[in-house]
Amino acid sequence: MSDVNKVVLAYSGGLDTSVILKWLQDTYQCEVVTFTADIGQGEELEPAREKARQFGVKEIYIDDLREEFVRDFVFPMFRANTVYEGEYLLGTSIARPLIAKRLIEIAQETNADAVSHGATGKGNDQVRFELGAYALNPNIKIIAPWREWDLLSREKLLAYAEKHGIPVEMKHRQGGSPYSMDANLLHISYEGRHLENPAAEAEEDMWRWTVSPERAPDEAEYLEIEYRNGDPISLNGKTLKPHELLAELNRLGGKHGIGRLDLVENRYVGMKSRGCYETPGGTILLKAHRAIESITLDREVAHLKDDLMPRYASMIYNGYWWSPERLALQALIDHTQQTVNGWVKLKLYKGNVIVTGRDSGTDSLFDPNIATFEDDAGAYDHRDAGGFIKLNALRLRIAANLRNKK
């Protein structure tokens, strides 16, 4: 294992990655560079710096990636109205390519010959991190401790930590959190423990970002989102940076019990997994984006996007953000968004996001003179519909005649 001289570790400062840090130093006899990403998880990150220093780490990166995360990853994904398996808004999946990108950049900056992560050998994240890393640097070495070591239980991790003087928070000594959680500006996820029984209802005190819809305010709240080229740029008339806008939508959505999801999903590695998610701001954005597209996109373009979306969602879920097919599809999606300009009004009420209005001063394809049920002064000739129907019925009539002859 002496071929590794320096490794960049995706480091949270928690129990798992702190054990990994020490394990890398001992097993590979290498220098470790730590990288901690701030993508809006809401945790204090400076303790990670202090922990890394305690292990003798000299190069410590703590990067605020919130703006880049929302601008270059979340918003491009939402231009496609992306949903995996009908429900999941891909909050964890979309964060991984950014972390992989920064790992590779830091490896280049520090002349490291390897990168490492704390994803387990059972999950999707190992695939996402590593596909991203190889796509950006095909010659990088990747160390995945969970696929190499024998510390496969919490008891073994704690024993290793105690043996090597790794600080352990009291919650871990007492059994740890009842859930495995992952958070960023788009969502927070919960897995493990009693959630592994898909028949068991999630406990109410699990949810952290949203109130129960039953306990949400009895009065609805209205908001208006302005779009430019498919991306939201302002909320209630105030222009905001992408990460600020999403954070405020998270606050508003959480207040009204919006964005809860209890899902059994198909992991890329082959198993089914139950997870619970809170995505309040993303749930609002999905509804708003579809609303502004409804009046600014040509019908066939909109339907084509809907046809392609599941494939696009799978690319992200499975870790192919940096693949040539995702980049090609993104170019098509972005082209369609040139006319997606205007505003959407929505009402938030007890877990529901209700569109109450939408308009575009520059790109609306809604023509009230044609769409009206009143006298349209000849804008639409009803007689044309007869020929349209006959031509579209031709193949149906031919098939019916054939059946009648049998």
UniProtKB/Swiss-Prot annotation:
Highest taxon of source: Bacteria
Molecular function via GO: argininosuccinate synthase activity; ATP binding
Positions of L-aspartate binding: T120, N124, D125
Pfam families the record matches: Arginosuc_syn_C, Arginosuc_synth
Binding site for L-citrulline: Y88, S93, N124, R128, S180, S189, E265, Y277
Cellular-component GO terms for this entry: cytoplasm
Keywords: Amino-acid biosynthesis, Arginine biosynthesis, ATP-binding, Cytoplasm, Ligase, Nucleotide-binding
Localization (cell): Cytoplasm
Keyword Nucleotide-binding: yes
Reactions mediated catalytically: L-citrulline + L-aspartate + ATP = 2-(N(omega)-L-arginino)succinate + AMP + diphosphate + H(+)
InterPro entries, A to Z: Arginosuc_syn_C, Arginosuc_syn_N, Arginosuc_synth, Arginosuc_synth_CS, Arginosuc_synth_type_1_subfam, AS_cat/multimer_dom_body, Rossmann-like_a/b/a_fold
PROSITE patterns: ARGININOSUCCIN_SYN_1 (PS00564), ARGININOSUCCIN_SYN_2 (PS00565)
Pathway: Amino-acid biosynthesis; L-arginine biosynthesis; L-arginine from L-ornithine and carbamoyl phosphate: step 2/3
UniProt-listed Enzyme Commission number(s): 6.3.4.5
Similarity comment: Belongs to the argininosuccinate synthase family. Type 1 subfamily.
Quaternary structure, from the entry: Homotetramer.
HAMAP family found in the cross-reference section: Arg_succ_synth_type1
PANTHER family: ARGININOSUCCINATE SYNTHASE
Protein name: Argininosuccinate synthase
Name of the encoding gene: argG
